[in-house]
């Protein structure tokens, strides 16, 4: 044992953290012991641990025989719901104890994150202690549409990503079957998509997570009957003309048939809840439905909620207040006060209409209005982490908005029991993880950023990469250059970055230079991981675009092409496809 290692162990012991001295050295083989009669979820946790280690270093896990390191997984109640304990194992090694299956997966994640993978093998972490989540609603929403990553990537890749998120303590996956992409339930493309969605949700269940469904109040297929369609003028945000009017008797029948088929399809996964959504992309502007949020939409909430509970007994109904105005919110709360059985909770995020919700805004200042959400219903957040001040979404690589996330959380956490960040892809991976730790124990964003960098790249580069993350967030803004529209297909002729002027982007060249130096220090596995590549390419693009007057050169286009491959965005619509020029080919 070298002097540096000995000093570290002495410091840990003096701090009250007791460790097995043998754990300070890297190993290439280890043995995993699972409980007798381990459940399928526990067995899967072991498999996920093995995958994580083998992807990051040249080491492997065995379940029999001799090994240099013993890792034991057990479940023992008494720690606290979904909590865990990591301790030394009698006879040597590490013992990961979960209060339950979710506690075990979270504890496994903590052990993996505090270990090292860059010293010629696996160096087990020395963190010891107990951790219990302070909030039970710790989820993520995948926007499974527009041919984004969740819509197009190989299913196994997405399943692994779900497992990655579970290791950070997330316990629920919410998805949306966006019907406007298809023509009917038996549309071959719809059948294929539902199979894919089911496999993704099944992966969440296998790792101990719940699943939930998001539905539009007046959901419709792309070929909905013209005579049943909604009147224009009732939508806010995204809107498609195929939406159906629920005030027409046949329109409500159409909606319930569509959603009933969906509930039957998902019933075997036992969805924990159904979220019913008002705007973006629902709505109807007819006299019987206006104002949509408090009138037509509430008809849908009653009938769709009743159907969901009938088809999937035990499921909870959550009402979304997304894009409702203050008058609509007040009316909805009054109706919920009169009908206590209508819903089981609310989905609300103060960054949409902070003055209306009373939950605060994203500028770190609490909302000054008296809260309108007054019916003693649990409220979960829905922070938007994908689209803020950028276009195309994820078009320039990683978008770490960790300081903004801290501001969102500070302003709204007192009114929330947890939340579900809104995700359009993997480019905001770091921001997702920051939110996972807000929900777990209110850990500050800066601490989570350090933990993420140490785990995904190396503990030795934490300070350098954390500084780059700050620079990237500081220089996060819309971009535009002449001719950008050529070859970029858009829906609804929408291009929010149009005519944006180049900005100063201070520190962009230095950040890229730092990333180049760090790249040379990383293991082969770390430097070729998608998490590193998207962060590296973002720094490259910021630097190149700054020095090139804001317009892309061939170096930028090569970066765009690589991002398209990482995100499987070859068929994505222009809002989420990196802006590679039409017919560009590498020289």
Residue positions per predicted region:
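Positively charged n-region of N-terminal signal peptides that target proteins for export
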Residues: 1-7
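Bacterial N-terminal signal peptides
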Residues: 7-17
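Catalytic-core regions of glycoside hydrolase
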Residues: 117-120, 145, 171, 178, ...
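N-terminal small/glycine-rich loop or linker at the start of catalytic domains
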Residues: 128-149, 230, 235-240
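Catalytic domains of carbohydrate-active enzymes, especially glycoside hydrolases
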Residues: 156-178
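Solvent-exposed, acidic/flexible segments
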Residues: 35-46, 101-104, 151-158, 190-194, ...
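Contiguous, structured surface segment used for ligand recognition
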Residues: 23-138
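C-terminal non-catalytic alpha-helical accessory regions
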Residues: 423-428, 444-587
